[in-house]
Structure formats: C-alpha cells, structure tokens
Amino acid sequence: MLGILTFILVFGIIVVVHEFGHFYFAKKSGILVREFAIGMGPKIFAHIGKDGTAYTIRILPLGGYVRMAGWGDDTTEIKTGTPVSLTLADDGKVKRINLSGKKLDQTALPMQVTQFDFEDKLFIKGLVLEEEKTFAVDHDATVVEADGTEVRIAPLDVQYQNATIWGKLITNFAGPMNNFILGVVVFWVLIFMQGGVRDVDTNQFHIMPQGALAKVGVPETAQITKIGSHEVSNWESLIQAVETETKDKTAPTLDVTISEKGSDKQVTVTPEDSQGRYLLGVQPGVKSDFLSMFVGGFTTAADSALRILSALKNLIFQPDLNKLGGPVAIFKASSDAAKNGIENILYFLAMISINIGIFNLIPIPALDGGKIVLNILEAIRRKPLKQEIETYVTLAGVVIMVVLMIAVTWNDIMRLFFR
C-alpha cells in the first residue's frame, strides 16, 4: 500500500508541476486555458476562475492535464439536431450553452442545433419551438459539456495557433523546464535535510563510526592522502585506488596513509566485503555553508541530468528494451524507495522529474520536444506548417509513443514477474 501511495504521490506531483508550466506560460502568451485538471477520469470538483479557466479535481489521482484553446483536438463539437439549452445575457447574446441535459437555469431557452460557430463568427442557429432562430454568442460564453464540466468557448484570437511564435515555444518548453526546477528544489530539500552538500573535491572525508578505518583508530579529522601506491586527492581518486588495490584479491589488506595536524602516518586496514566490493567505511565530506548548499542543488541536478543524457545516448546507439522502464518499473522503483525512508523518496522524486523533463524534450512530435521543433521550423519559415501536415506528424508521433509504451510495459511485466 505504501508503494502505491508513493507512486501516486510522486507521479502526481511531477505531472501537475509539468502541466502548471504549460498553464502559466500559455496564459502569459494570451492563450486561453479552458481547463486545468488535477487527476483523471470523472470530475468531483469544478470551479471557473475569473481568468476563464475551469479548475477541476478528478477522481483518479494520476497526474493531471491542461486544455488549451486550439491545442490538439480540443474543440467543441455539436452534432446537428443536438438538444441544448441557452442562457441569454441582458444584451440578448448567448452566455452559456448547456449540453449536459441537466437543468441549470430556469429561464434557459431549449434549442435543437442546426448550425454553430464558436471560433470566428460566434453564433448558434437552431429550432426553438419549431421556429428557426439565430443568436449571437458572447466572446466569453461557456459550454457545459456532457459530463457537466463548464469551460469557455475558444474564439480564434485566444487559440494556441494565434499566439506569437515565442509564446508558443515557451509554452511548450515550460513543462520540461518545470520538471528541472522541481528536481533542483527537491535536491535543495535533501541537502538541507542532510546538513550539507557532499564535498567530492577534497580528501577530507567523513570517517564512519563502525567502518574499517574507524576500527583501526583513524580519527574523523584525518585526511587520506594515499592508498597503497596511489595518491588520493578527492572522492573519485579514493574509489579508483580502492578498486585497483583490491582487484582480483580475496580478503585484501590496504596500506592507508593519513595526514593529521601536519604529520603523516600509515595504517593497515582490512576493508569490509560488501557483495564483492571492498569498503573502507568513509563518506565524502560535507559543505554546510549556505552558498555551497544553494549551489549544490543546481550541481546535483546537473550531474543527474548528464547521467540521464549519457544513458539516453547509449540507448540510441545500442537499443535495448531492458534499459527502458515504463510505469511498471517506475512503480517497482517507487515501492523500493518507500521502504527506505523519506530521503530515498525525495531522491527518487527528483530523479524521475529530471528524467521526465529530458524525455519530454526528445523531438518526437507527440512530445514537447517535437512541438518545439515545429515552433523552430515555423520561426525559420516565417509561417506555420499546414494544419493537416502538423496533424499527421503529431499522429505519427502518438503512434510511435503508444507502440513504445506497450512494448516497454510488456517488457517490464515479463522482466519483473516472469524471469
């Protein structure tokens, strides 16, 4: 149960933060956000803000989404003959079109729709008591959809397609950008919880109380300057020295040179065997000043992003489904993190957020990266691609993503449960 809750919480936070990036910059770019939803499925709460956005909470706590006017297939479709009820404003214009069948307004006018245009000419036409009538529709009118969600109509001037090229580009980039920001913030929280940021650039290490070095009397304040014949100047050189000195050896002993108060001495240590790796019982030192901790959030996030990019590069040149993880693998990892405490959950949250940010920047049309490529092409050509071409390109991207997701999920299930 804890694993399920952790998965829902981590995935939910990441998706909502991602979608909020699209939401915020869409509004700044003059694009109408028709709905900002937390969760999926049937709605359990809805509120229309003064900004015209419907804020909804939906029953399945799995992420969320934004509906931008003119983005994708977000259009209002009314079939000929559909019964609706119209609420009129004082000036005679329609301010609400109710498609839900529920009675929301005692004075609403029933109509069977024969024609409508909510994008350009803003009118609705149909039969009212067997008489055909046409009504002008207010620019900020709302539509009550079949499930009861009330959203603004989407006239052309507030649609995604009519934003500036830079407005569209930043709107598409903002989702992944928020994922990177979330990663940095969570790493900050971790660093402050741990009392500082790891200092891997010095040979002043933290000697663990029950470790191999502590058992031979090495004090916490000592510096490790040499292991065997290998100089030690930082954390990486210590790791390499231990691995080199213990390679192909059983129960090895190490000659460790330490420096304390200006004098050097050598101690002989028997490292602890941990599943084939030999440990001295040391950790990197910690920088606890505010500036180091602040910068540490950025550097830790950057290091994580570089590792993910390196793994992605290897995957491109050496494709292997076993190197990919879908929802099942993420659930398994979240369950493992939940068993090991809040710090592991936070680390998992930061890493997955950065991972999703990078993944979304891959130039596949269905992803934000693909949309950004289309924005760049539009900027170069000084005109957008034809809507039909953009639709087909996006559809191809969706097909690729669906096939990949099915393959990865199937591979996850087979790998985790049947091997």
Swiss-Prot record:
GO terms, molecular function: metal ion binding; metalloendopeptidase activity
Keywords for the protein's UniProt record, in alphabetical order: Cell membrane, Hydrolase, Membrane, Metal-binding, Metalloprotease, Protease, Transmembrane, Transmembrane helix, Zinc
EC category: hydrolase
Record-listed Zn(2+) binding positions: 18, 22
Record bears the keyword Cell membrane: yes
Family of this protein: Belongs to the peptidase M50B family.
Localization: Cell membrane
Keyword ATP-binding applies: no
Protein name in UniProt: Putative zinc metalloprotease spr0242
Native source organism of the sequence: Streptococcus pneumoniae (strain ATCC BAA-255 / R6)
Major localisation: membrane
Cofactor requirement: Zn(2+)
Membrane topology field: Multi-pass membrane protein
Active site: 19
